[in-house]
From Swiss-Prot:
It comes from Burkholderia mallei (strain ATCC 23344). Keywords: Lyase, Metal-binding. It catalyses: 4-hydroxy-4-methyl-2-oxoglutarate = 2 pyruvate; oxaloacetate + H(+) = pyruvate + CO2. This is Putative 4-hydroxy-4-methyl-2-oxoglutarate aldolase. Substrate binds at residues 80-83, 102. It comes from the Bacteria. Its EC number is 4.1.3.17, 4.1.1.112.
Length: 165
């Protein structure tokens, strides 16, 4: 799917004004091997525990984007090389992490988009804590399962519905 977030913003100024198209804060860095990705959102809300991330990525991604609201924690990584490979294998379009990743070199080789706040060498806990498929608030932007995510080098858009066919 070819698109530019800049063009989508220009073409949908009415949606931006109405709040049905939103722009995430420009704080996410690219780590995956794919720099432009889009798809309907699947959501996770968790904190310093990536058990649910693995569970989600083990499912058929069907071109979806996994949005991981890790509370913005910079104390450990929620996605690493093994999970990047799992996302690629299972057909996920991308992962947006409000938190950290690790194994940056491995993630760069995965054919999946990965955006995160930073890299961190420490792994997360594995307690099975968190919530899946619920609305999340990522840095002030509400994302509900099924919202459309569009990401490229210029930013990340969240739309209530698909903007492209």
């Amino acid at each position: 799917m070819m698109f530019a977030t800049t063009d989508l913003c220009d073409a949908h100024e009415d949606r931006l004004a109405a709040g049905t198209l939103r722009v995430l804060e420009p704080v996410f860095r690219p780590f995956g091997g794919v720099r432009r990705f889009a798809g309907p959102a699947a959501t996770l809300k968790l904190f310093e525990d990536n058990s649910l991330v693995r569970t989600a990525l083990e499912q058929d991604g069907a071109g979806r984007v996994l949005v991981v609201d890790g509370g913005g924690s910079l104390r450990c990584a929620l996605v690493g090389g093994n999970l990047g490979k799992l996302a690629e294998k299972n057909g996920w379009a991308g992962i947006v992490v409000n938190g950290c990743v690790r194994d940056s070199d491995e993630l760069a080789e995965c054919r999946v988009g990965v955006l995160a706040l930073a890299a961190h060498p420490r792994k997360s806990d594995k307690r099975g804590a968190g919530v899946s498929d619920a609305p999340v608030d990522v840095r002030g932007t509400r994302i509900v399962p099924g919202d459309w995510i569009y990401a490229d080098a210029d930013g990340v858009l969240v739309s209530d519905d698909a903007l492209l066919e």
